[in-house]
């Protein structure tokens, strides 16, 4: 998606970079992605936020956790022979598509840095693991989503709230329904 020229003219000088959690949020709720782009903090007392962090911290103990590289925050990284494997840990496969696009974003950005990797989605509570390889079609999807997010971030106001099945558990719910 092309970045809207009018929006770009009026944009602040420094846009925050698109990050993986923003891609995930955008798939679920564009308003949440906009709030994240403004560095508005979610409700830190949210039970689901705590549970997700706990699962991530306590699962896969032997693997290298939370590796930061430029604007990327990778949950797990390991080597399998000559291949770098980047994994994203999620509480549930209920948001599988959002998690898949988040991981695809990481693979896309790593490829742009000259780092070849493959991905794994990990759902420890379900004892599931899914492989992900960045192909041309998936790379185009990532580019399109990045463009949509940039256009969203350029907006002065967030999109109006739209109720979906994730609202009840969302740590940003107070910003929509209070």
Regions found by a protein language model. Give the residues of each.
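Short, intrinsically disordered, charge-biased short linear motifs at domain edges
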Residues: 13-16, 148-161
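Active-site metal-binding core of divalent-cation-utilizing nuclease and nuclease-like domains
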Residues: 46-82, 95-98, 131-134
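Nucleic-acid nuclease catalytic cores
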Residues: 79-153, 174
